[in-house]
Amino acid sequence: MEDFVRQCFNPMIVELAEKAMKEYGEDPKIETNKFAAICTHLEVCFMYSDFHFIDERSESIIVESGDPNALLKHRFEIIEGRDRTMAWTVVNSICNTTGVEKPKFLPDLYDYKENRFIEIGVTRREVHIYYLEKANKIKSEKTHIHIFSFTGEEMATKADYTLDEESRARIKTRLFTIRQEMASRGLWDSFVNPREAKRQLKKDLKSLEPCAGLPTKVSHRTSPALKTLEPMWMDSNRTAALRASFLKCQKK
């Protein structure tokens, strides 16, 4: 699964997922299903916001070219993928500026057009079950919830899907592709049933003998893409076209 993640997702997304897991003391090399799930969630959040802008009349528009968009305001603020301190700083800033109620939990996005925070969910189970779990956890009518599944289903608060049909179809197609790629490598079943995967992992670890003399040096280099992304997120004039270029699936 780890090899699949590094092949299928952009290095920027992989590094953000690794950083998030390490922040909570989790190891991407061991909890590989979670690693894949976090990468998938990050990519959906990026795709959700791509190409969506607000014009001078405060109308939502979709533009896919680069330079002409520099003066347009991005419709969505991406909160997911930041470290917790920076994420809460962004949330507090939005609340102070817009007057919206501060959420109890960190949301994934903020929609400047609808003036609401958005919680994105990607599930391997039934969408309505996952939606209810999210709603029960958040316990706030102010945060909008939008759930996607790998089977093409979706569910949103009050059936308000926020995005146009084409944008949502793009996300669903990507999720279906990820599922197909996992299935072709024999990874889908364990991804759907994490408990079985954990049992198999424990069994595999017990069967391994300590190996002496193996290289243990780990590279801590930061990818140029990540260095570009961090200041870009803080720049209100960043372009969706540049950010979208990071999201192409890299295949062998």
Curated annotation (Swiss-Prot):
Main localization, broad class: host cell
Top-rank taxon: Viruses
General function of this protein: Plays a major role in the shutoff of the host protein expression by cleaving mRNAs probably via an endonuclease activity. This host shutoff allows the virus to escape from the host antiviral response. Hijacks host RNA splicing machinery to selectively target host RNAs containing introns for destruction. This may explain the preferential degradation of RNAs that have undergone co- or post-transcriptional processing.
Gene: PA
Any Gene Ontology biological process: viral RNA genome replication
Protein name: Protein PA-X
InterPro entries: PA/PA-X (IPR001009), PA/PA-X_sf (IPR038372)
Coiled coil stretches, renumbered: none
Subcellular location: Host cytoplasm; Host nucleus
Domain notes: The probable endonuclease active site in the N-terminus and the basic amino acid cluster in the C-terminus are important for the shutoff activity. The C-terminus acts as a nuclear localization signal. The C-terminus is recruited to host protein complexes involved in nuclear Pol II RNA processing.
Entry similarity comment: Belongs to the influenza viruses PA-X family.
GO molecular function, a single term: RNA binding
Organism of origin: Influenza A virus (strain A/Duck/Hong Kong/2986.1/2000 H5N1 genotype C)
Record site feature (Important for efficient shutoff activity and nuclear localization), residues: R195, K198, R199
Annotated site, Important for efficient shutoff activity, chain positions: K202, K203, K206
Active site location: E80, D108
UniProt keyword terms in alphabetical order: Decay of host mRNAs by virus, Eukaryotic host gene expression shutoff by virus, Host cytoplasm, Host gene expression shutoff by virus, Host mRNA suppression by virus, Host nucleus, Host-virus interaction
